[in-house]
């Protein structure tokens, strides 16, 4: 049984829209990182859906999605480490307070 492409695209579009909404409206740094992860998961879903639709015997989309997941995990670890370091100095995770590069 093959998963139909439109279901993958609808789910990926919904995830992408939720991620964009969270990215735009959130002022908390941890929520922003979670929204970025949602965006990357929507991209992964598109990669796997199109890969399955175009050539089910080829696994290029799945392999590329694994690379994206690996990069996303590294990005989340570095991002959370930066947020934790800023929280220790500023006692907040509000994005408006992250003005460390200002004079």
Swiss-Prot record:
Disulfide bonds: none annotated. GO terms for molecular function: oxidoreductase activity, acting on NAD(P)H, quinone or similar compound as acceptor; quinone binding. It is found in: Cellular thylakoid membrane. Its EC number is 7.1.1.-. InterPro entries: NADH_UbQ_OxRdtase_chain4L/K, NUOK/Mnh_C1-like. The chain crosses the membrane at residues 5-25, 32-52, 66-86. It comes from the Bacteria. One of its GO terms (biological process) is photosynthesis, light reaction. It catalyses: a plastoquinone + NADH + (n+1) H(+)(in) = a plastoquinol + NAD(+) + n H(+)(out); a plastoquinone + NADPH + (n+1) H(+)(in) = a plastoquinol + NADP(+) + n H(+)(out). Its main location: membrane. Keywords: Membrane, NAD, NADP, Plastoquinone, Quinone, Thylakoid, Translocase, Transmembrane, Transmembrane helix, Transport. It is a multi-pass membrane protein. NDH-1 can be composed of about 15 different subunits; different subcomplexes with different compositions have been identified which probably have different functions. NDH-1 shuttles electrons from an unknown electron donor, via FMN and iron-sulfur (Fe-S) centers, to quinones in the respiratory and/or the photosynthetic chain. The immediate electron acceptor for the enzyme in this species is believed to be plastoquinone. Couples the redox reaction to proton translocation, and thus conserves the redox energy in a proton gradient. Cyanobacterial NDH-1 also plays a role in inorganic carbon-concentration. Belongs to the complex I subunit 4L family. This is NAD(P)H-quinone oxidoreductase subunit 4L.
